[in-house]
Amino acid sequence: MTDSEHAGHDREDGELEDGEIDDAGFEETQDQEAKENEKQKNEKAYRKSRKKHKKEREKKKSKRRKHEKHKHNSPSGDDSSDYSLDSDVERMQSSRKKRTSSYRDYDVPFSQHRRISGSYMTSKKSQHNKKTNSKEYAESSFYSDDYFGNYSDDNFGNYSNQEGEEDFSSQLKYYRQSQESSGSSFSKESGKKLRSKGSPPGTEYRIKSFDVSHGHLLPKKIRRKEHCGARVIKGPYVFSGMDDFQEYSKPGKKWKVMTQEFINQHTVEHKGKQICKYFLEGRCIKGDHCKFNHDAELEKKKEVCKYYLQGYCTKGENCIYMHSEFPCKFYHSGAKCYQGDKCKFSHDDLTKETRKLLDKVLNADEELVNEDERELEELRKRGITPLPKPPPGVGLLPTPSEHFPFSDPEDDFETDLSDDMKKIPSLFEIVVKPTVDLAHKIGKKPPAFYNSTSPPGPQFEESSHCPQRMYSSESSPGPGSKVPQGCESPVRHPGSPGHHPCVGPPGPPMQENPSLLPSSSEIVGPHSQAGGLVQLDTLPSMGGAYHSPGFPGHSVKVPRESHSSPASLYQQMPSEMQRSADSESMQGSAEFYDDYYPQHAAHNFQPPDNSADEMWHEEFAQQQPPIARDTAHLGSGPNSSSRMTSHCPLSASGLPPAVQRALFIPLTQRYQEDEEPAGTQPHRASSKEEDDTANWYSSSEEEEGSGVKSILRTLQKQTGTLRNQQLPPTELSVPTDPRLAKEKRKRNQVVDPRLRTVPRQDIKKPHESVPVDLRLVWDPKKLRGNGGAPGGSSARGAEFDLRHTNAGANHKSKRREDDDEDSERELREKAFLIPLDSSPGIVLQDPRSQLRQFSHIKMDIILNKPNFAKHIVWAPEDLLPVPLPKPDPVSSINLPLPPLIADQRLNRLWNTKSDHQGALSLDPTSAAKAKLSLTHREGCLEQSGDLHSSGGKLGDPRLQKNFDPRLHRLPNTESHQVTAKDSHSSRSALPLARWNPALSQPSTAAPINVASVTPPLYAPKLSSEGLPPGTSSSVLSGISLYDPRDKGSLSATELSTISSGENTESQKKSGLKNSDKNQPSPGEVTVPQNTTADMEVPVDGPVDMQTDILRSADKVQVPAVHSLPIQALTGLLRPPYSDPRQAREPGQASPTPDEETDDKPLKEVFKTFDPTASPFC
């Protein structure tokens, strides 16, 4: 409110203002009426304007609050705080033009209006001016309250109310002058110009409030800046002086006009100054832009700065925690400080404060130690013995004691470089000390380089640490690419099992193409067998050994003919491989290693299918370390092999190939850097960048060569690659004998009998592989000797020499095995060492697993039985595993069928059986009968029919009780005289024996049960006991096709001869298998020791069976009863088949033991046990 309005309100009626004339009468009453009217009008307008501006003020306050929230924490500089002023200037000028008339009304000094406001001479114009003045000034006062309300205190409010209106006209004059002098361009400097002309202290606020009230001429940001331009100090004036105001209104400063309450809230009095309390607490985020004073020295907190302790504190000297002032605990506790003058902590004398700090630190250390001891005591109280603490200095990575020669690769592999390794090794040089088991494999004693425990990855043919130039061609044997012309180069190292003195004339390689690699047509045999290179019969297109001079004892053969161009092979490669390298290096191929991992290793791998071929090739090409490609580039021509040097006898490692690669890669890289020709530098430089993927200690999980996952992946890929490399040549070899297709499929199967039992449905082409010397291929000693050494021993390759004659054919390998089988195979291969020469006393895998593959080939196979097998005769009483069971009273109720019904049933059963003989795969008798001749079948049909009558169940106890127990007393020496007379017999019986995986063990002796050793079922003690009553099979088991006329058909001697050794074996196996179901009679159980004999003498069973069957069939020409019609048999078949379970005497608790009855004649046996037998027996 203006002073005039205050005066109008405060003045009583009739009270005169200064200078008014006290006239009475008519004029006074008129004047009073006019005054009242004016008062009412002014009050109404005042109320309206007040309401209007109150609403506007509230709106703007809410907007400003929102804006302040966003801008509060980010102190903005001058550039960001100034909005563009052009639009504001235009608005200001237009609004000024609108209001020029009202401004000019104020040209008359305002004091004059005030002086004459009460006189009669007051004109309507002056009254109107007074009204507008009061309105507009009220607006300005509201806006000033709006903008200063938060920061003004009572003094400021009083000041604005107490100031008189006498300066108002001068303010307007100054304002217009400043606008005109600046050429109507408003800027921040206008306020300074105005102030520099000596305006009184409150002038600027008047101008600002006026500007705000008339069209909001200033932008928000500028207004706020100008409003907050000075500090508020208690006293009659807001400003202490012009200088002070100008100092705080500089553009860089953002001082706000704050209330004392606000100041007290955010500052603390410190040494007589109001200091920003956040600064004193060390957490003022505004820094130099803070509104409050930071002029104080902070006391540091009595703690060491943890960031300084860790190495770097960003706050430096401004940090409120102690840095170098903190006392050094080593120096002050009496220990030696190894940092000396460079110590980060203070070595100054201790003060009271620093002594307290030091004591606190030392006590904390002691508390930690005491806490450990307390924990150990608690563990001991609970009965737990804590592990001893490791000695000091033992960390996660062991200190390297003996190292591989990273510093000087020229030295021997076994060289101890502890003197050279005094520098701290990098992570890539640290070699974890091996366990005791691996110590002899890593440099301690040099075993064969390619150990038989694990197939080395192909990268090691080239990345061995000896810097030998292995190739005499310019091309690189790229890891996954195809080799042209079927060239292989087995670069063997001097310590490997395949290393022998070179056999073959050295000669220059005949290369039609610079990318051809020298190939070998020789396979190196094991030390125990050959003693030198085993030269196999090679195809005419191959020949001519090339002896590389730098490798003493490395035989390399070169093809004499080239059947396809490298371009054709390049087109056959997978697209992934074609992208992986240039065309020249692509022509070196994975088949480069084919003879390096000889063909005999193919026994460990299943033939793969086509579908996975490209995948394996491409994966391996991506994963293979570039070392393989690099080393091949070392040679620049045929003469490059002469530059090969063999610095060291290579020590080998049985570690996984990924570990070997990680150990040998640094060495190979150095040799490549030293000896690489200049022409190959660009290629090597590019590939060296990829070598980091093979770093064993790399921390990147995404690199192929690092991490446990990639190591396992590498192992799987290497085994797949070995198979890749071995299989393509087998497909391209000459199809000489179509029967060998089956042999090839079986030859690639895994030797392990656990995997043998699963029949593989592998489909191979009939022209695949040609083993040239079958004696070498199928020698079981060699198979056994190398069975556990899948790719490591090159002795496996001594049995095959497979050459390509059509290298232009499509190189595709087949892959059927999944990763689980690969990992299992890796475990098997690394499980144990198998010596190269198999000692005679050691029993290895069942040789039948290999014989099954060769059953179609006529050849001599000599299998030795153990010495004790010929001299042991087992008595039945020696073989009783458990006491005999008591008879089942319920099952003895079953009565036999009348003869005619029984014979009809048997006849039907026999007819269906003979029709479906091959279908009963569970019955070993059917498997054997499928191979027997018709003569044998006619002679033995009676007995085999009995076995089939039980329903073909392998586990049926009655099937196991078909043997006369008296036969087992007789010596079984005759069976051993026929060791391997006819390979046809083994060929006919063994494949069927292996037909069903469940029968793999007892199958060899099973045919004898059927064909020759089935005594008549009327023998009472052979009946089944313990079966549930009423089963139909129990009735059928008692049915006998015995013909009384044929009593002499099989004498006891012949029966014993037939059944001697093999009968006991088969009975033992089948009887023990079913011993949980029924208690076997003494004749059923056999020699546990014969299992070894059975493992090694699979041929005896079939051979003895068939020779004895032939003998018995010649003597017994009487046909079986089944050849007669059923009606003709009615009078012939009397009850001799009667139910054996009723044969017991009433007082018998169990069947009579074998000892009592074995020596009695047949008649006495039947009279004793079978009261229903006919009188003539």
Curated annotation (Swiss-Prot):
PROSITE patterns: ZF_C3H1. Residues 179-188, 493-502 have a biased composition (Low complexity). Keywords: Coiled coil, Metal-binding, Phosphoprotein, Repeat, Zinc, Zinc-finger. It comes from Mus musculus (Mouse). GO terms for biological process: negative regulation of DNA-templated transcription. One of its GO terms (molecular function) is RNA binding. Residues 1-137, 179-206, 383-416, 446-587, 622-654, 670-767, 780-826, 942-988, 1043-1101, 1132-1162 are annotated as: Disordered. This is Zinc finger CCCH domain-containing protein 6. Residues 27-73, 347-383 form a coiled coil. The gene is Zc3h6. Residues 13-31 have a biased composition (Acidic residues). The keyword Zinc-finger applies. Transmembrane segments: none annotated. The modification Phosphoserine is found at residue 1150. SMART domains: ZnF_C3H1. The keyword Zinc applies. Residues 512-522, 564-587, 713-728, 1050-1064, 1077-1093 have a biased composition (Polar residues). Disulfide bonds: none annotated. A zinc finger (C3H1-type) spans 271-297, 299-326, 327-350. Residues 47-73 have a biased composition (Basic residues).
